[in-house]
Amino acid sequence: MTKQDYMDEAEQVLFHVYNRFPVVFDHGEGVYLYDTDGKDYLDFASGIGVMAFGYGNRDYNDALTKQIGKILHTSNLYYHPPLVEAGKKLTRVSQMDKAFFTNSGAEAIEGAIKVAKKYAYLRDGHAGHEVIAMEHSFHGRTVGALSVTGTDHYREPFYPLMDGVKFATFNDLDSVKQQVTTATCAILLEPLQGEGGIYPATKEFLEGLRQLCDEKDILLIFDEIQCGMGRTGAMYTWQHYGVKPDIMTTAKALGGGVPVGAFLVTNRVAEASLVPGDHGTTYGGNPFVCAAVSKSIDLMEELQLPEHVQQVTPYFEEALAQLTKEYEFILGTAAWASCKDF
């Protein structure tokens, strides 16, 4: 089949919800993708932040092949070694206490919201609690995740969304405080806004949120789906600030290309929120994806990817600054690890 044949047949059988580029990729190796004609492309997108250690890594491929030969899937009603190993490694590098594996970042957000609502339900003895999210944020495309996404053009066609959501101005503590009521159960934000324009939270803002949440018994949720897994020079962005959340979500590079996400909580939250029957998943945390998570974390550490980000940041800052001088339409630049408020 020719490239055009693939594209034509795709339009016949696939729901047209992506404006795809006219290229058909066949395989990848290192930082390059190769199309069906053999042409190579330097992959600056990394599969939208997923392929942190590139394509065709032999250790990663061997680990997944080995797991396929053992067992791909079993119910979450049973234990299996890859689940335990992945959980141990993820809680260690995230500095959180308990993990729940999901199939995507959006599912992780949904789970985080449920944890916060159940925590408040047990605390107050009734439902009807609210979440404060940030303007210009992005948390996913499921109805719940979209409800806490502060970008109107994503939300508007799907009203009414989940109620009990208020929006505050990012990096404006007073704006958040104005939205807090006795019904507030959580404050949700990205420590480094991605879709909103690569905007880092200030240290003062995160410290103020932490203090506010502690005073009001509100749970602080950090969405690290896009900015986590080494992209800012630490495994998770909040670790730069030293402001620990009560709940954290992660995905993207977590599985090295395999669909997986997770939400993590502190022991305090785990002991006062979800119980058996409150939440679950068929595929989340199965042996195959957990083998991928475990090997991805291993490679992150073996290849010292967070440290590498720190090393190459000055080069990118200089190169990006030069582009602003050469092209008038570039108003400014931002890099994941060049945020000076840490």
Which residue ranges define each predicted feature?
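Conserved N-terminal phosphate-binding loop of PLP-dependent enzymes in the Aspartate aminotransferase
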Residues: 1-342
